[in-house]
Design a protein with these regions (language model features):
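Short, amphipathic alpha-helical interaction segments positioned at domain boundaries
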Residues: 83-90
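Short amphipathic alpha-helical interaction segments
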Residues: 48-63
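Short acidic, hydrophobic short linear motifs in intrinsically disordered regions
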Residues: 33-43
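A composition-biased, non-transmembrane "mature-region" signal
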Residues: 35-36, 56-58, 73
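Minor-groove-contacting beta-hairpin "wing" of winged helix-turn-helix DNA-binding domains
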Residues: 74-80
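Short amphipathic alpha-helical elements of helix-turn-helix/winged-helix folds
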Residues: 22-30, 42, 85
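Short alpha-helical segments that sit at the start of domains
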Residues: 1-26
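A short, conserved structural fragment
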Residues: 62-72
Length: 90
C-alpha cells in the first residue's frame, strides 16, 4: 500500500488516535499524574511513537485541555476533561 494513499493516511490517523487514548488511559491508571519521561517510555514501547510524534501528541492533549503540564516538574496531570474523554466510547 502506498503510504500516501487515502487508505494509508486514514489508517495512520486511526492508529494515532488509539495511541492517544491508550496513553491517556495509562496516565489515568497510574493515578492521573506521571512524569513526561514515563509517558514517553510507555508510548514508545507500546506504540513505537518517537519523540516528535510524542511531542505532537502531548501538545494536542494540553491544547484540548485533556492534560495539564508542569514545566518545572515535567509532570503531566489528567484533567476532568481528560477523564470525560476516556469515559466516552472510542
Amino acid at each position: 500500500m502506498d503510504p500516501q494513499s487515502p487508505e494509508a493516511i486514514e489508517k495512520q490517523k486511526q492508529f494515532f488516535e488509539r495511541a492517544r487514548r491508550s496513553v491517556l488511559q495509562h496516565l489515568s491508571d497510574q493515578g492521573g499524574k506521571l512524569n513526561m519521561s514515563e509517558l514517553h517510555d510507555f508510548s514508545m514501547k507500546k506504540f513505537l511513537i518517537q519523540h516528535q510524534r510524542f511531542s505532537i501528541m502531548m501538545e494536542g492533549f494540553v491544547n484540548e485541555g485533556l492534560v495539564e503540564f508542569d514545566w518545572g516538574t515535567q509532570d503531566a496531570t489528567l484533567t476532568d476533561a481528560g477523564r470525560q474523554f476516556l469515559a466516552k466510547p472510542a
